[in-house]
A protein has these predicted regions:
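Beta-strand segments within the central parallel beta-sheet cores of soluble alpha/beta enzyme folds
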Residues: 75, 124-131, 161-173, 317-319, ...
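Alpha/beta catalytic cores of group-transfer enzymes, especially the acyltransferase/condensing modules
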Residues: 159-209, 355-356, 413
């Protein structure tokens, strides 16, 4: 299997980094993990909703090989100032400690910690070099990195895990329990299970996956990611953590009021929803706003799925846009730069829908765009965004994404 042009460029960076930093990857393997683009329900995973999304072609590449010792030695081409992250298996910093707060090394540390805690015997260290081109927020860079390292350490140690949802759980535990980031399972699921050319539907009730191609006759469209040039420091330091806590608080309040629910997604009946708003809207207006977004987005989700299967990308785009308005106005999870991007592209004919992506505050927005309108959208962004957000005039980026496999392994290239 050959690398794409972008993959070869990444490999060139990896090979130079390996040479400059004394990392031996000769004869090893390359694992590529994707980013993800969620079509619904954004912020639904920790609220119990069904999910739908695709893997997208912004990646993290890891070139690695077993080194015959109990040491892990890793270098990131994206964070060269951190130098080589090196540690012995079984000897990593404590979870959430000050020692890990400012280094990307918290991810491999956390993976070693969680795998050991869960009973996996890691005896074989690796040498590896990483490089990625996933934007700094909105496309699940941390989940992609975590999955890549878990799979690579399993491979080096001859560990096979048949149940892929277990790998999702391990990746989530690294962020939840070690790093302190309160992420759900959306990102890991949408990346690990992603298939080229397919939408991935996830049902949390039985953790089943269904692959859905877009229906025949769909208009030719592109997934566009609008990287604002801002970089979110991490979910644990973001509005995401506050919103998740608010949703959990509302569930607790409703349970004490004898509502038979375990998560906000359990509120599907409009009569029950209206009763809750009437009962708690005055005493807990912010919490009811969060419910308003989840309730309406969940109802729209089923219409979006049917539209996707029917090839009606126009309706998919309309729902994507309305979800964005709900995320901005009711969930209040967006950010000024994210909304600037949305405001710019919304005015361009051929844009079917646009909204913020991912955890919120910073990072990237996304749009569904008719193929013939992509260049006009790019010109609009290039003209208006630097003028509106001069601090990020040299940092923003415009990505036209393909739907790809979430994980690929390359051999014989090193």
């Amino acid at each position: 299997m050959e690398l794409t042009k972008e993959g070869q460029a990444a490999l060139d960076i990896i090979l130079k980094s390996a040479k400059d930093n004394g990392i031996d990857i000769k004869g090893g393997k390359i694992r590529r993990t994707s980013s993800r683009f969620c079509l619904g329900v954004e912020h639904g995973d920790y609220n119990g909703t069904e999910l739908f999304g695709v893997g997208t072609d912004r990646f993290i590449w890891l070139a690695y090989k077993p080194n015959g010792t109990n040491k892990v030695r890793l270098f990131s081409g994206n964070f060269p100032d951190d130098g080589v992250v090196e540690f012995d298996l079984g000897n990593v910093p404590e979870p959430r400690s000050a020692q890990i707060a400012e280094t990307w090394g918290r991810f491999p540390y956390g993976i070693e910690y969680i795998l050991r805690r869960e009973g996996y015997k890691l005896l074989q260290g690796i040498d590896g070099v990483l490089y990625g081109n996933i934007p700094g927020g909105g496309m699940s860079r941390s989940a992609s990195l975590t999955l890549n390292l878990i799979l690579s350490l399993f491979d080096a140690n001859g560990i096979e895990v048949q149940e892929k949802n277990k790998i999702v759980d391990l990746a989530q535990a690294v962020e939840n329990d070690y790093i302190g980031s309160p992420c759900g399972k959306l990102d890991q699921t949408m990346i690990l299970f992603a298939r080229e050319g397919m939408g991935t539907y996830y049902n949390p009730n039985d953790r089943s996956i269904e692959y859905l191609p877009i229906g025949s006759g769909a208009s030719d469209f592109r997934i566009v990611v609008l990287d604002t040039g801002t970089d979110r420091p991490g979910l644990e330091k973001s509005t995401y953590a506050i919103r998740r806590a608010e949703c959990e608080k509302l569930v607790s309040i409703l349970q004490k009021a004898d509502y038979d629910i375990s998560c906000l997604a359990d509120i599907k009946d409009e009569t029950v929803y209206k009763k809750i708003i009437d009962e708690f809207g005055e005493s807990h207006p912010d919490l009811c706003d969060r419910l308003r977004y989840i309730f309406n987005a969940q109802n729209r989700f089923y219409k979006m799925l049917e539209a996707w299967k029917a090839g009606n990308i126009e309706t998919v785009g309309q729902i994507f846009r309305v979800d964005g308005i709900g995320l901005r106005n009711d969930y209040k999870i967006s950010g000024p730069e994210l909304e600037t991007m949305c405001d710019i592209v919304r005015t361009v004919p051929g844009v079917l829908g646009e909204r913020m992506l991912g955890g919120g505050d910073k990072g990237a927005s996304g749009a569904l765009v008719r193929a013939e309108s992509v260049e006009a959208v790019k010109q609009a962004v290039d003209t208006a965004y630097p003028r509106s957000r001069p601090d990020f005039a040299e940092k923003y980026a415009f990505h036209i994404c393909k739907v790809v496999d979430g994980v690929r392994l390359y051999e014989g290239l090193l």
